[in-house]
């Protein structure tokens, strides 16, 4: 019997927290569907979503300032359990009649939490026990404000040396507040605390599993498509691979895969992708040579957003032409949840655009094909789990992500054939050395970036002006936040040496040491 994977659901209201997506991932790991929405979402949208519980994220603001964000007041009146985390706890306390003040000593980092009342959230959870027999937890703090006076109906359920009210609860109304961050790995018992809220307090049934997601996706594809054909664009990445596999599992020979050779793929990628999909998927694969088309469309374009939109436009036009030849009505795309969030295309359209993804905001408005996006609700780690469950090879599943517009957004400014050729070679050297040194699977994404600037160097006995190549490698789980990869200097030196010696047009190699945030993973 098919499970309704969306029946039990948690709503996360985001107060611009750097950890908001991490909260969502933790809830998904518990096995319950959740969505992330802006904290100023309208009442109708929340009621339509019909959550079993609501989580208020942390945030960078100070609650007591008049202009700062507030939780929608009605959520405290609908009988739904609410969990406030950090800023979320503070705004809940403030809005319900408590007091919030600046703390004399801000807490950032590790703290030891003393549990005063373990009921519900802390039941059976401890890292240590105090001499008085009280449960002690190691937690991660990041705050400069504290709840100084509880709202009516609340009691203190935990404290730290610097925060007498480090956790609070109104058991009757099922409102809970945590001053610390249970979603981060630095709070070892955080997963269990969130599970207590989601499973025991909100009484959600954990139906959000890989097996159930696959079953639901197949059913959804079959119901939407019927007997019609679907065209899926392949890029060599995990998202398009899992999309194609899901669609193929749902409708079999009604699927036609199209690999568009844009001229902007990595070195030898066209042959590699064709080999993988014809061997492992057994689906019909058409390769379209569109190199001239893409180069002509991108000529003279330097703006990153324009390049993304042009790439999206050209992809769709190629697919539409192939679809007309084959009488196909549907386009399957590997859009995933982080694409949706970053493109600010949530269900309400609210949010600030970080960058437009070519398969979200970059799609033309007059597109003739109907869209099917089976991965749209999934984070990258969930997509990979699906791929493994579907039997795709691990090398493909854990291949580093590659953007839809390809090397066009790894070349700063205008794209031309010379720049593409240089970048392909540099990127291939970097990836080859990562694999030879067994670092490839220790980082989540790695690539080279071409900078159309010339820097002076010396080759032989002569001065040499050549281009600059930047190397980027990051570690991440969900691609919403990322840390730059601290690769050994000896390794980076070897890669740099090869690039400047094997590519005569390059005179300098630099390494990007910026996290996300503040930077994005891609340079454009």
From Swiss-Prot:
RNA-binding as UniProt keyword: no
Metabolic or biological pathway, per its Swiss-Prot or TrEMBL entry: Purine metabolism; GMP biosynthesis; GMP from XMP (L-Gln route): step 1/1
Uppermost EC category: ligase
Keywords associated with the record: ATP-binding, Glutamine amidotransferase, GMP biosynthesis, Ligase, Nucleotide-binding, Purine biosynthesis
Domain GMPS ATP-PPase: 208-399
This protein's record includes keyword ATP-binding: yes
Reaction catalysis annotation: XMP + L-glutamine + ATP + H2O = GMP + L-glutamate + AMP + diphosphate + 2 H(+)
Annotated PROSITE patterns: GATASE_TYPE_1, GMPS_ATP_PPASE
EC number: 6.3.5.2
GO cellular component: cytosol
Active site as annotated: 86, 181, 183
Domain Glutamine amidotransferase type-1: 9-207
Domain of life: Bacteria
GO MF term set: ATP binding; GMP synthase activity
Amino-acid positions noted as binding ATP in the UniProt annotation, renumbered to this chain: 235-241
Physiological role: Catalyzes the synthesis of GMP from XMP.
Protein name per its UniProtKB record: GMP synthase [glutamine-hydrolyzing]
The species this protein was found in: Coxiella burnetii (strain Dugway 5J108-111)
């Amino acid at each position: 019997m098919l499970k309704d994977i969306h029946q039990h659901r948690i709503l996360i209201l985001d107060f611009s927290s750097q950890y908001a997506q991490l909260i969502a991932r933790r809830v998904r790991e518990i096995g319950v569907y959740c969505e992330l929405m802006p904290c100023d979402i309208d009442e109708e949208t929340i009621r339509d979503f019909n959550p079993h519980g609501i989580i208020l994220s942390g945030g960078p603001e100070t609650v007591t300032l008049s202009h700062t964000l507030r939780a929608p007041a009605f959520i405290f009146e609908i009988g739904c359990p609410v969990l406030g985390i950090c800023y979320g706890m503070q705004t809940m306390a403030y809005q319900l009649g408590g007091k919030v003040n600046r703390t004399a000593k801000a807490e950032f980092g590790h703290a030891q939490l003393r549990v005063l009342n373990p009921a519900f959230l802390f039941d059976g959870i401890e890292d240590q026990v105090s001499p008085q027999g009280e449960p002690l937890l190691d937690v991660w703090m990041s705050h400069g404000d504290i709840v100084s006076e509880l709202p009516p109906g609340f009691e203190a359920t935990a404290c730290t040396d610097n925060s007498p009210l480090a956790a609070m609860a109104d058991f009757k109304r099922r409102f809970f507040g945590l001053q610390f961050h249970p979603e981060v790995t630095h709070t070892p018992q955080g997963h269990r605390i969130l599970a207590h809220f989601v499973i025991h307090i909100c009484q959600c049934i954990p139906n959000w599993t890989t097996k159930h997601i696959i079953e639901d996706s197949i059913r959804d594809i079959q119901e939407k498509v019927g007997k019609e054909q679907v065209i899926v664009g392949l890029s060599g990445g995990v998202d398009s691979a899992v999309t194609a596999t899901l669609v193929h599992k749902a409708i079999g020979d009604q699927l036609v895969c199209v690999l568009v050779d844009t001229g902007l793929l990595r070195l030898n990628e066209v042959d590699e992708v064709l080999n993988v999909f014809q061997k492992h998927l057994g689906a019909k694969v058409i390769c379209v040579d569109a190199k001239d088309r893409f180069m002509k469309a991108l000529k003279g374009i330097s703006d990153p957003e324009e390049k993304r939109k042009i790439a999206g436009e050209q992809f769709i036009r190629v697919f539409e032409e192939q679809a007309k030849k084959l009488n196909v009505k549907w386009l399957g795309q590997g859009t995933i949840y982080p694409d949706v969030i970053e493109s600010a295309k949530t269900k309400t359209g609210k949010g600030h655009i970080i960058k437009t993804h070519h398969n979200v905001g970059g799609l033309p408005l007059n597109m003739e094909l109907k869209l099917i996006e089976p991965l749209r609700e999934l984070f990258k780690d969930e997509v990979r789990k699906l791929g493994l469950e579907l039997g795709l090879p691990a090398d493909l599943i854990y291949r580093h992500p590659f953007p839809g517009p390809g090397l066009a957004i790894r070349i700063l400014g205008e794209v031309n054939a010379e720049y593409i050729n240089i970048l392909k070679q540099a990127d291939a050297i970097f990836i080859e050395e990562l694999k030879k040194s067994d670092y490839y699977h220790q980082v989540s994404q790695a690539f080279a970036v071409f900078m159309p600037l010339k820097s002076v160097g010396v080759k032989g006995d002569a001065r040499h002006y050549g281009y600059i190549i930047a190397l980027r490698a990051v570690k991440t789980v969900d691609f919403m936040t990322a840390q730059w990869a601290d690769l050994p200097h000896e390794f980076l030196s070897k890669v740099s040496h090869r690039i400047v010696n094997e590519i005569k047009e390059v005179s300098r190699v630099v390494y990007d040491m910026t996290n996300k945030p503040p930077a994005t993973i891609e340079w454009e």
